């Protein structure tokens, strides 16, 4: 694996060369929760990969040949095949690469995890809206009430299942797909939103012990530094906390 701590490529940069045989490339951004999903799966399945970080405020022109809207993550293999949308990319990795399957083999259990993901679907947008409101000094009481309700819905799932993780007694795909937003609650200033959800707090504690989660954890001070620059529209935000030469 390479690229975890490489600087972002921006406008005017040269496109990277072909993807080497036996490696998959991910176009990513260190602080992006959607990229985080896919990187968790890459790490959990020990897939050989390289990371190309993209400056999302100053995107290279060539990157639009990888994704029509210039979003991350995007996977690219040595056959020049491109896969984007984070959930689709994660499922592709699970289907194509050997090792422990993160999605269940059983069709019903797989469908059930996708239904759980639908129950989660409002959390990313509500988290983002709360973050923006807090950073801009606006009242976010109603937004936090709405976010707490969505988290209560997830709490009820864990209570009903009486399991440590959303997919059962061991980590599976659904846990990795929702984790990035829970990791960000503290740095977003929203940690109190799980004060009323004891099962979710136990799940969070269990997730923090997972090797893939630990490997991709970003220090809170670095994340806060990124957010400070990001909300100043500073294109250097995406490289905050890195040192050394740009790797292209």
From Swiss-Prot:
The active site is at residue 32. GO terms for biological process: cellular response to arsenic-containing substance; glutathione metabolic process; L-ascorbic acid metabolic process; xenobiotic metabolic process. The keyword Ligase does not apply. The keyword Transferase applies. It catalyses: RX + glutathione = an S-substituted glutathione + a halide anion + H(+); L-dehydroascorbate + 2 glutathione = glutathione disulfide + L-ascorbate; methylarsonate + 2 glutathione + H(+) = methylarsonous acid + glutathione disulfide + H2O. Residues 22-101 form the GST N-terminal domain. PROSITE patterns: GST_CTER (PS50405), GST_NTER (PS50404). Its EC number is 2.5.1.18, 1.8.5.1, 1.20.4.2. Residues 106-231 form the GST C-terminal domain. InterPro entries: Glutathione-S-Trfase_C-like, Glutathione-S-Trfase_C_sf, Glutathione_S-Trfase, Glutathione_S-Trfase_N, GST_C, GST_omega, GST_Omega/HSP26, Thioredoxin-like_sf. Glutathione binds at residues 59, 72, 85-86. GO terms for molecular function: glutathione dehydrogenase (ascorbate) activity; glutathione transferase activity; identical protein binding; methylarsonate reductase activity; oxidoreductase activity. GO terms for cellular component: cytoplasm. Keywords: Oxidoreductase, Transferase. This is Glutathione S-transferase omega-2. It comes from Rattus norvegicus. Belongs to the GST superfamily. Omega family. Exhibits glutathione-dependent thiol transferase activity. Has high dehydroascorbate reductase activity and may contribute to the recycling of ascorbic acid. Participates in the biotransformation of inorganic arsenic and reduces monomethylarsonic acid (MMA). Gene3D superfamilies: 1.20.1050.10, Glutaredoxin (3.40.30.10).
